Structure formats: structure tokens, C-alpha cells
Amino acid sequence: MGTLQEYDYLWFFLVIASIVPILAFTISEILAPIRSGPEKLTSYESGIEPKGQAWIQFHIRYYMFALVFVVFDVETVFLYPWAISFHSLGISAFIEALLFILILMVGLVYAWRKGALEWS
């Protein structure tokens, strides 16, 4: 089997992965009815009639907390496999994980000093 033939599966996957979303959006545009009106501009409250304005502004602090949460949630996802196979990885993996945690701690201290974690 030649080297180029090994990449045939990759090219096939990339072509299919490109065609499927385009096809899904195209079929949706063709088949979906286009209805506009005041009901389209209201928020959906699980079948309950919404009260008040549908368009409100959220305070930027919510986004800052969400951003910090996402960063440390992703950190957990990356560190879990490392912790599971800690004994078999060796010292280089330990140093890399330590460097990763150190970089994230620098980011946490930066966010803390900028006041991103204060709610006042």
C-alpha cells in the first residue's frame, strides 16, 4: 500500500465532513417555512408566557466568571488523563503538567488582580 493511498481515508472524511453540514443547511432552507412576526421576537420560556422585556443586558461580570470557569474546566479535562496515567509517564510529563498548571495560575492571579473575580 502506497503512502498516498493511506491518506485516501483522510481525504474521504474531509470531503464528507464538508458536504454534510452544507447539505443539512441547504435542505433546511428549502423545506423550512419562512414565517416572521412578533412571536419570533419573544423569548421562549418553556411554554410559559414571558413576563417583561425579552431583550435585557447582562452584566459583564457574568461573562468574566463564565470565562474563568471555562478555563479551569478545560484544565480539569486536560489534567484528568495525566493524573490517571501519572506513574507510567515519567518525570518529563510531570514537568509539563507542572508548567501547564503554573501558566494557568498566572492567568488566575492576573484575573484576580484585575478584579474579574470580585462581585461588588
Curated annotation (Swiss-Prot):
Pfam family, one: Oxidored_q4
Entry's Gene Ontology cellular component terms: chloroplast thylakoid membrane; NADH dehydrogenase complex
Entry's Gene Ontology BP terms: photosynthesis, light reaction
Location within or outside the cell: Plastid, Chloroplast thylakoid membrane
Transmembrane segments: 10-30, 64-84, 89-109
Topology versus the membrane: Multi-pass membrane protein
InterPro entries: NAD(P)H_OxRDtase_bac/plastid, NADH_UbQ/plastoQ_OxRdtase_su3, NDAH_ubi_oxred_su3_sf
Major localization listed first in the record, in broad terms: plastid
Record flagged with keyword NAD: yes
Any GO molecular function: NADH dehydrogenase (ubiquinone) activity
Entry EC number(s): 7.1.1.-
Alphabetical keyword list: Chloroplast, Membrane, NAD, NADP, Plastid, Plastoquinone, Quinone, Thylakoid, Translocase, Transmembrane, Transmembrane helix, Transport
Top-rank lineage group of the source organism: Eukaryota
Reactions this protein catalyses: a plastoquinone + NADH + (n+1) H(+)(in) = a plastoquinol + NAD(+) + n H(+)(out); a plastoquinone + NADPH + (n+1) H(+)(in) = a plastoquinol + NADP(+) + n H(+)(out)
HAMAP family xref list: NDH1_NuoA
Chain's role: NDH shuttles electrons from NAD(P)H:plastoquinone, via FMN and iron-sulfur (Fe-S) centers, to quinones in the photosynthetic chain and possibly in a chloroplast respiratory chain. The immediate electron acceptor for the enzyme in this species is believed to be plastoquinone. Couples the redox reaction to proton translocation, and thus conserves the redox energy in a proton gradient.
Assembly information from the UniProt record: NDH is composed of at least 16 different subunits, 5 of which are encoded in the nucleus.
Stated family: Belongs to the complex I subunit 3 family.
Annotated protein name in UniProt: NAD(P)H-quinone oxidoreductase subunit 3, chloroplastic
Classification of source organism: Eukaryota, Viridiplantae, Streptophyta, Charophyceae, Charales
